Amino acid sequence: CFNAQLAGGETSRVPAGSSAVISIAATGSVARDSLVLRSTGRPGDVLMVTGRLGGSIAHKHLHFMPRIEESDWLVSNFKPTAMMDISDGLAKDLPRLAESSACGFELNFEVLPRQEGCGVDQALGDGEDYELLIAMAPKQVAELQAAWAKRFPNLELTAIGRLVEKGKGITL
């Protein structure tokens, strides 16, 4: 599924009635011109997310496929200024991206794409979404949204806010 190789490992017996513990380490490489960091956003960049947020309490995260194809396409065709996945919830990961980029942020709570049955609080805080959080130059947004709708018609891409100068914006 992910073209990965198992390079080693060790198994041992787990005492009856105990839970198994599995630990995995992964490494990778990326060409410099394909590298997008969370620390390279700029004031004025539009903040976008893929998919819908929230729902881990209802086990949505157990049936999720990482956005590898989508992020590869995005970097190859539009080169975001900053990007990361949302693993700890938007309320934790958006401030991390903004702080790493020496920015503040504004967020439009009304447009947050949410899983069915999820409120704004769940969309912000559930975690385990593994959707992409993207910062894009404003001049690219309309073209990106049109191309995205053609390439990934079953996956939403929603503008949810923007990066602003450090010290401005909101706090989550």
Which positions does each model-derived feature cover?
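Helix-biased detector of long, well-ordered alpha-helical tracts
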Residues: 1-172
